[in-house]
Amino acid sequence: MKLFDSRIWTRPALLVVAVLAVQLLLPRLQAELGYAPLSAAVAQENEEAAPQPKERETRRTPALRNKVYEKLAEAQAAAEAKDYNTAAKILDDMIASGGKKSLNSYELANVYNLYAFIHYSREDYNKALKAYENVVSQPDIPLAMEMNTRFTIAQLYFVQENWQKGIEALLQWFDMTENPNANAYVLLSQGYYQVKDYDKALKNVETAIDMYKAKNKLPKEQWYNLARFLYFEKNDINKTVDVLEELLTYYPKKQYWVQVSHMYGEQQKEKEQLAAMETAYVQGMLDKGTEQVTMAYLYLNADVPYKAAKVMDKGLKDGSIDDKSKNWEIAGSAWRQAQEVEKSIPAMEKAAARSDEGELYARLGNIYLDGDQHKKAITAINKGLQKGGVKRPDNARLVLGMAYFNDKQYAKARDAFKAAGRDERSAKYAEQWIKYMDSELERQKKLAEG
């Protein structure tokens, strides 16, 4: 009999996605948005080469004149010193002195680029976005500058949780990029994840993972997590397991042992389910009481009650498993199944004492009977019946009759058997016990008469 169904708690465990775009983008943008008016490089993570333009189109980019360069450098110094008011005033004066027409397209693009940095630093993302849009609207700016800016625009939309516009901006960047790197594919995947287009999200994160594998590089843990979640959402259990097994190869953490155990359960691979959870347990990873209880259930399902009992006993003693009736009941039942009646009794005593109903006292009485403690069995079962909530009072009264019989309280035993026999489910057994008791009493009478 299967005691435990992992599906009840599989979904909550796997719905947590370790990577969300908005959580990752803001710190990255803060690191990347340093203003460099003379630089055309796309900000990238150190381990990846900067993407190149898809086509080497010829652009006649105007020169940056010395007097404009000097003003931009002055504004940049103020911005880097966090004197944003002074930086903005310098830029305002540059435009006001001769109007926008006094600046060529490249100079104006650099002015808007620095405006965007100032607005971003002030956390005014709407104005920052508008300024960046003004950068890319200028004709004949360097391709690398346009690529960098379009990528930043996409990131800012994601920071604002404007997922669809972020996706559209990022796709524009992809269109003009010859060799998008893996991080860009992950960013696009996160955008699609947020708009619940899981197929496209999965395609892009898998592309990123494959790109790293092709270079013999270890894909990032967050990427695997995003793929894992997306496969689970598509109800592709086999692929979810594949990803979890890869995670365990490179990032052998507790959460992945627990999750893959759940997934093996979904695949009805009970041996693998137990082995995965046991691996986490023996390494001391299962520090939560609920996880230890799950471990015990898996042992019980596998007909290894002794190990289940040991898990429960250890957790209850060290306090990691909650001191409540249900947990003591599991421990007591496991010890009993393991034929350890003496250890089962104190656990079930605690379970019964903490329960609001009499069922556990009835079960405790049964265990007392197994241990030949007949008087205690009588007391426990009567207490359970008086308390109420016994699932099968007829069964409890049968056991009560046996305890009275073994304690030589024959009249009370007869009453208990008769009471049990009023329920048709126990009538046959009650009648058999009464006949057996009558024959035994007759035998004892004849022996006494000599």
What do the PLM-derived regions correspond to, one by one?
Residues L64-A73, N104-Y112, P142-T152, T177-L187, ...:
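Generic helix N-cap/helix-start motif at coil->alpha-helix transitions
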Residues E57-A63, A96-N104, V136-P142, L171-N179, ...:
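Solenoid-like repeat scaffolds
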Residues L3, L26-E133, A144-N148, R425-G450:
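N-terminal leader/linker segments that initiate helical-solenoid repeat arrays
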Residues S325-Q339, I345-D394:
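Alpha-helical adaptor scaffolds
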